[in-house]
Amino acid sequence: MSEKSQWGSKLGFILASAGSAIGLGAVWKFPYMTAANGGGGFLLVFLISTILIGFPLLLAEFALGRSAGVSAIKTFGKLGKNNKYNFIGWIGAFALFILLSFYSVIGGWILVYLGIEFGKLFQLGGTGDYAQLFTSIISNPAIALGAQAAFILLNIFIVSRGVQKGIERASKVMMPLLFIIFVVIIGRSLSLPNAMEGVLYFLKPDFSKLTSTGLLYALGQSFFALSLGVTAMLTYASYLDKKTNLVQSGISIVAMTISVSIMAGLALFPAMSAFNIQSEGGPSLLFIVLPQLFDKMPFGTIFYILFLLLFLFATVTSSVVMLEINVGNITNQDNSKRAKWSVILGLLTFVFGIPSALSYGVMAEVHILGKTFFDAMDFLVSNLLMPFGALCLSLFTGYIFKKAPAMEELHLDERAWKQGLFQVWLFLLRFVIPIIIIVVFIAQFM
């Protein structure tokens, strides 16, 4: 008899779900969008939109996943009593397969830099020009592909061990370490001269800087930041027992995700202000700007290694769910088939990701609609598949998913005031969230 995957504890579910949401964007993009768009004003808009958009969508994925208790691609057909709805699950499966194929490229770069920095600790070589070093790494086919393969192997190892022994155990180690490293780096960053100028630059409200672009980013980020629209949270919820309170768990996950984004800014901007270093975030921040910054500090190599580990943990806890969902889809969450399909899907992901890994080297001149293969895949997932998936998920939950099981899953069927909250949740899913998703989607092409 096949053994269905399940969480060993509520804490494991919360940490794994938060880890899924806390990806590279939360650490190297969100703080810069915050600072550039009015600091505290942007944060306020983001918090409000997360409550009105992200949190309701998160609860929708949780309710759907636990109610169905099957793989993501079968969830919608089962709950909608018609297999035609399974296309929503396939959107997520396709998006996450593509996402892991290029996400693993960045994960590989982090592994390479960790090796370089550990080598510096033992005086096994210097680095010199960091911009030149980064270019030499990403343009070298052997290094790029080898690093990508190593990162995918790490994901295969974790996912093949199962939900409890693999994903949950890894999350219970990586997520606390991520927060501990953040505290250490924030403490060091705030101890530097002129650190408070960086804090004010990051957090001081200035609504005059909150542009329409920034406003739309805050709205979009409210569901992107929680890995919504690609059935990641739905899949994790399908492994839950019926006792776990989904609303309380959702609040914890949202709080952790927002906290990490704010902590990233507190770690970065005070140090950058102290040494008068500028950056717009993204890969250049981690691989060029930060090593230059830490070179100016006592024990800088150690602090940079901690920062790289922080990014690695954020990357791995996000990437394992990308592989896990499709392993669950193919095996129908049967653990006896998990190891074999983890390897097969990992290899397929690596092969599909080869053009992305080579996009900064031998395939740099290969373009799709004016974009490198890496950027084209990023655009396909982030700008097309995720918004469309979130829209379909919102409409399915609002109009197709039966009210009774939804209320039961969310524990909002007991008292009148809870039933009132359920009606508000349903209204948001039916009307408010779809309109906002459509507006954000159209605005990106204008």
What residues fall within each predicted segment?
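Inter-helical loop and helix-membrane interface segments of multi-pass membrane transporters/permeases
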Residues: S2-K4, Y32-N37, V70-I91, S104-Q164, ...
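Loop-to-transmembrane helix boundary motifs in multi-pass membrane proteins
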Residues: G12-I14, S20, L145-G146, M256-I262, ...
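Helix-loop-helix connectors at the membrane interface of multi-pass transporters/channels
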Residues: K4, K74, G107-I138, Y239-K243, ...
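Transmembrane helix-boundary motif of multi-pass solute transporters/channels
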Residues: G12-S49, T231-A237, V247-I251, A255-M256, ...
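Membrane-embedded translocation segments of transport machinery
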Residues: S2-E3, W7, E168, K172-V316, ...
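Membrane-interface "cap" regions at the ends of multi-pass membrane proteins
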Residues: M1-W28, L57-F62, R66-L79, N83-W90, ...
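Select transmembrane alpha-helical segments in multipass membrane proteins
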Residues: Q6-S17, F42-V45, K84-F97, G146-A149, ...
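A generic transmembrane alpha-helix motif of multi-pass inner-membrane proteins
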Residues: L145, T372-L395, K418-M446
